[in-house]
Curated annotation (Swiss-Prot):
Listed Low complexity bias regions: 1-14
Main location: nucleus
Functional description taken from the UniProt entry: Histone acetyltransferase that catalyzes histone H4 acetylation at 'Lys-5'- and 'Lys-8' (H4K5ac and H4K8ac) or 'Lys-16' (H4K16ac), depending on the context. Catalytic component of the MSL histone acetyltransferase complex, a multiprotein complex that mediates the majority of histone H4 acetylation at 'Lys-16' (H4K16ac), an epigenetic mark that prevents chromatin compaction. H4K16ac constitutes the only acetylation mark intergenerationally transmitted and regulates key biological processes, such as oogenesis, embryonic stem cell pluripotency, hematopoiesis or glucose metabolism.
Subcellular location(s) per record: Nucleus; Chromosome; Mitochondrion
InterPro entries given in the database record: Acyl_CoA_acyltransferase, Chromo-like_dom_sf, Chromo/chromo_shadow_dom, HAT_MYST-type, MYST_HAT, Tudor-knot, WH-like_DNA-bd_sf, Zf-MYST
Domain annotation Tudor-knot: ranges: 55-110
Top-level EC class as recorded in UniProt: transferase
PANTHER family: HISTONE ACETYLTRANSFERASE (PTHR10615), HISTONE ACETYLTRANSFERASE KAT8 (PTHR10615:SF82)
Activity regulation information from UniProt: The acetyltransferase activity is inhibited by anacardic acid derivatives.
Residue positions, PTM Phosphoserine: S37, S42, S348
Protein name: Histone acetyltransferase KAT8
GO cellular component assignments: chromosome; histone acetyltransferase complex; kinetochore; mitochondrion; MLL1 complex; MSL complex; NSL complex; NuA4 histone acetyltransferase complex
Length: 458
């Protein structure tokens, strides 16, 4: 997590990108292979007149998730949804990432003995079947990948004391996600996390956003009126990349402060550890869009500090949920490294990475390195790879370690590969070529003048 005093608009974590073929939020991919989920049962009809348990804040109940499975969930908050005229409860599924927290109707909670008994009986049957299956051990690496894919939340006991304290403080501040969904462009999107929209905007169950200027509104009527008045059809700033229907705009946070602040508030709905939103001037934003006759529709973005003391080439990165698993996340990652190459520097995303961010970055780094190792003939060092790719040596070492392609020998890391091993990895869907790649010929960009002066002095 970024330090509280940091002047960062989006500097807390890198998140919200799902690699192609990787599960999105809520999808369950087990290490053991697909199996019937525990607690999956159609809700039985309670007996007539059967009393219900009163829902109390802070208590734990069985709750039916959108995939029809039942899980223990803590009730965090309640509200009356004025837009839909009903009482709702905000629940956190015990042991799951807070991304899956949601507002639910009362009828999704097991509040009668009939419903609780039916769910319990089904769970016991599942556990009995599971116990009869042969035991299968998983490696530490498999467990890590399983936890990342399935959004398994780390317990405080698994964190170091400093991280645990910061995590508890962050969770207390952002515990309740009031904005449950947004409407932007042609999409209605479920929010994943709390975002600090100002005043009563932040307490609305649903917000409407203009996809061009990113103005947010409480009411559909206001939104429809705005669409008829708004003159924007693309992000502000300068278009620096165009190929086919893919376009990227460079937006300076100092020149377009309101737009960038609105972008940060939008992004926070899908990023957990993003702590600062309004001091956007130290950042440059790169907005990825899909272009058609109506205009340039925002797909995602990444931001970077104008001057990063830690050598980060990305402060925050996000692909909006409707566009995930289509190659845009890796395109944004690749684009950030193309800028680093033009600056003649190496860079790395700001840490910590989210679970989805780790998967996408590791997949991208692996593909880039495997492509070079497949075609290269001769001696190649980790420093050489770093200069060729603008990926830091630490990121290269950790990636090669995950591929079993590096050994520590006589005080240094040595690349140890065979053509067969490289080809085997490249056949894996995890390391296949991204569906959308950056064409450097179409990139019209040069480093800022003050950076060009520094480069000329090197």
């Amino acid at each position: 997590m970024a330090a509280q005093g940091a002047t960062a608009a989006v500097a807390a974590t890198t998140s919200g990108i799902v690699g192609e073929g990787e599960p999105g939020p809520g999808e369950n991919t087990s290490v053991e292979g697909p199996a019937r989920s525990p607690g999956r049962v159609s809700p039985p009809t309670p007996a007539r007149g059967e009393p219900e348990v009163t829902v109390e804040i802070g208590e734990t109940y069985l709750c039916r998730r959108p995939d029809s499975t039942w899980h223990s969930a803590e009730v965090i908050q309640s509200r009356v949804n004025d837009q839909e005229g009903r009482e709702e409860f905000y629940v956190h599924y015990v042991g799951f990432n807070r991304r899956l927290d949601e507002w639910v109707d009362k009828n999704r909670l097991a509040l009668t003995k009939t419903v609780k008994d039916a769910v319990q009986k089904n769970s016991e049957k599942y556990l009995s079947e599971l116990a009869e299956q042969p035991e299968r051990k998983i490696t530490r690496n498999q467990k890590r990948k399983h936890d990342e894919i399935n959004h398994v939340q780390k317990t405080y006991a698994e964190m170091d004391p400093t991280t645990a304290a910061l995590e508890k403080e962050h969770e207390a501040i952002t515990k309740v996600k009031y904005v449950d969904k947004i409407h932007i462009g042609n999409y209605e999107i479920d929010a994943w996390y709390f975002s600090p929209f100002p005043e009563d905007y932040g307490k609305q169950p649903k917000l409407w956003l203009c996809e061009y200027c990113l103005k947010y509104m409480k009411f559909e009527k206001s939104y429809r009126f705005h669409l008829g008045q708004c003159q924007w059809r693309q992000p502000p700033g300068k278009e620096i990349y165009r190929k086919s229907n893919i376009s990227v705009y460079e937006v300076d946070g100092k020149d377009h402060k309101i737009y960038c602040q609105n972008l940060c508030l939008l992004a926070k709905l899908f990023l957990d550890h993003k702590t600062l939103y309004f001091d956007v001037e130290p950042f440059v934003f790169y907005i990825l869009t899909e272009v058609d006759r109506q205009g340039a529709h925002i797909v995602g973005y990444f931001s970077k500090e104008k001057e990063s003391p830690d050598g980060n080439n990305v402060a925050c990165i996000l692909t909006l949920p409707p566009y995930q698993r289509r190659g845009y996340g890796k395109f944004l990652i690749a684009f950030s490294y193309e800028l680093s190459k033009l600056e003649s520097t190496v860079g790395s995303p700001e840490k910590p990475l989210s679970d989805l961010g780790k998967l996408s970055y590791r997949s991208y780094w692996s593909w880039v390195l495997l492509e070079i190792l497949r075609d290269f003939r001769g001696t190649l060092s980790i420093k050489d790879l770093s200069q060729m790719t603008s990926i830091t040596q630490n990121d290269i070492i950790s990636t090669l370690q995950s591929l079993n392609m590096v050994k520590y020998w006589k005080g240094q890391h040595v690349i140890c590969v065979t053509p067969k091993l490289v080809e085997e990895h490249l056949k894996s869907a995890q390391y296949k070529k991204p569906p959308i790649t950056v064409d450097s010929v179409c990139l019209k960009w040069a480093p800022p003048k003050h950076k060009q002066v520094k480069l000329s002095k090197k």
